[in-house]
């Protein structure tokens, strides 16, 4: 009797664990569900009880199927099951290279574990994801006519995209200005405000760009006229009286407080702190609302005096020395 129990009990324990019915898990990162010329897709598989036996990924369209990935995993013995409990595949899907045309398709995923269910074939999990293959770039149609911009000035362009886009707007040299829908009833019509830097001349390339949900990108020029502008040149005299009065308020900046002289404090504020401020304003401007939050032109405060102009080119003199040059923004 003891011998029977010694044999039956371990077998029962093994059967209990090896015949478990918990199916493996599949997680797919596929946002948005559109495949362009090339798309990176991450697929994660897990089976904490019996371990992963095999994974398979295929792409099906119009009755044609191509295997995108297939992988078998090692067995670690009757007690443990599979040697691998979790794994992930990084897939690069390129439809055209595999002979697929644009249109609706199905991504299929399957994973099996090392359980003894289904006549030792294991538990299986199967997942389908409907995707849209789109390898064509969006087309752009400019609706506005006048796009005249001076150096340091701004302009606006109204345009239509042929399909929903992840991003669209105006590229001015190295600067990108996003466009947004919502200003017009037609959701395909977008409005983009853009600017020409004070240091960007009439030869600066200005292009309309769009990237659709599949990552396909298009760009096109549009009629525009860029005007050169001469900015005011100004020389400012920096005195000890001014430095002793103004600089202490900047001692909250560690670099300024550590400076050895008032003149050095001024140079740090006028250069490094100024550049940090420009960078902060640029970062804030990257996250714009998709609506116009003002009405009419921007005006100077009533009864206020004009102290400086945009992009004034300033020379700073201390005694008989030129100590700095900056552009006032």
Language model feature labels by segment:
Residues 1-188, 193-201, 206-232:
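Surface-exposed loop/turn and intrinsically disordered segments
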Residues 86, 216-319, 323:
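Polar/charged, compositionally biased leader and regulatory segments
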Residues 324-329:
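C-terminal soluble interaction/assembly domains
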């Amino acid at each position: 009797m003891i011998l029977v129990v010694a044999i039956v009990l371990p077998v029962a324990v093994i059967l209990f664990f090896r015949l478990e019915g918990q199916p493996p898990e599949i997680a797919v990162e596929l946002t948005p569900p559109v495949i362009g010329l090339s798309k990176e897709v991450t697929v994660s598989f897990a089976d904490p009880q019996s371990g992963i036996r095999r994974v398979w990924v295929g792409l099906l369209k119009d009755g044609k199927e191509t295997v995108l990935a297939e992988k078998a995993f090692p067995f670690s013995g009757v007690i443990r099951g599979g040697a691998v409990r979790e794994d992930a595949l990084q897939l690069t899907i390129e439809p055209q290279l595999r002979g697929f045309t644009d249109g609706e398709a199905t991504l299929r995923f399957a994973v099996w574990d090392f359980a003894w269910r289904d006549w030792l074939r294991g538990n299986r999990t199967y997942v389908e994801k409907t995707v849209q293959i789109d390898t064509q770039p969006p087309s752009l149609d400019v609706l506005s006519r006048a796009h005249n911009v001076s150096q340091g000035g701004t302009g606006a362009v109204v345009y239509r995209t042929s399909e929903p886009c992840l991003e669209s707007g105006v590229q001015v040299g190295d600067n990108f200005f996003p466009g947004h829908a919502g200003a017009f009833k037609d959701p395909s019509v977008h409005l983009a405000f853009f600017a020409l830097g004070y240091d960007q001349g009439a030869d600066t390339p200005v292009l309309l760009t769009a990237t659709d949900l599949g990552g396909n990108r298009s760009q096109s020029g549009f009629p525009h006229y860029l005007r050169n502008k001469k900015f005011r040149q100004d020389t400012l005299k920096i005195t000890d009286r001014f430095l002793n009065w103004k600089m202490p308020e900047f001692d909250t900046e560690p670099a300024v407080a550590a400076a050895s002289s008032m003149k050095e404090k001024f140079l740090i504020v006028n250069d490094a702190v100024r550049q940090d401020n420009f960078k902060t304003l640029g970062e804030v401007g990257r996250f714009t609302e998709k609506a116009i939050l003002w009405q009419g032109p921007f005006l100077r405060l009533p009864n206020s005096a004009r102290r400086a102009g945009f992009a004034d080119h300033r020379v700073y003199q201390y005694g008989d020395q030129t100590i700095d040059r900056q552009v006032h923004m």
